[in-house]
């Protein structure tokens, strides 16, 4: 005959086993919101929520000649496409061209922003500063 103590221990053991089995399937979601630095130009871009989508705009530039770009929205509304990933239009503020953009979180302080035209893609890893 099983006592209450044994039944409780068995229940706790079963719950712990289920948790350990499910652990690898739990995705670690990183937050893209905040200010990020583009390493190649020193440009700072704020990623923010815009109606449940991911938007981004230029908030600071290193090169004074690019000061007119401050406030330019470069990502007007990307949608989540997978865990830690968003896809949407991406504006190149320098030439005005629109690309397919993919934001992939690589950790809490690193994201990769990739722009694609047809099958040609180029990406860069940005660092979170705020």
Where would I find each of the regions flagged by the language model?
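Central antiparallel beta-sheet cores of small beta-barrel/beta-sandwich binding domains
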Residues: 32-100
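Bacterial N-terminal signal peptides that target proteins for export
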Residues: 2-16
């Amino acid at each position: 005959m099983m006592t209450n103590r044994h039944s409780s221990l068995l229940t706790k053991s079963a719950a712990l086993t289920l948790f350990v089995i499910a652990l690898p399937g739990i995705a670690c979601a990183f937050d893209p919101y905040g200010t990020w630095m583009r390493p190649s130009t020193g440009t700072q871009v704020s990623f923010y929520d815009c109606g449940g989508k991911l938007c981004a705009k230029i908030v600071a530039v290193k090169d004074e000649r690019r000061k007119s770009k401050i406030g330019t929205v470069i990502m007007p509304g990307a949608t989540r496409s997978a865990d830690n990933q968003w896809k949407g239009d991406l504006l190149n503020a320098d030439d005005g061209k629109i690309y397919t953009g993919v934001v992939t979180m690589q950790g809490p302080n690193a994201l990769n922003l990739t722009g694609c035209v047809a099958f040609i893609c180029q990406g860069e890893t940005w660092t979170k500063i705020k």
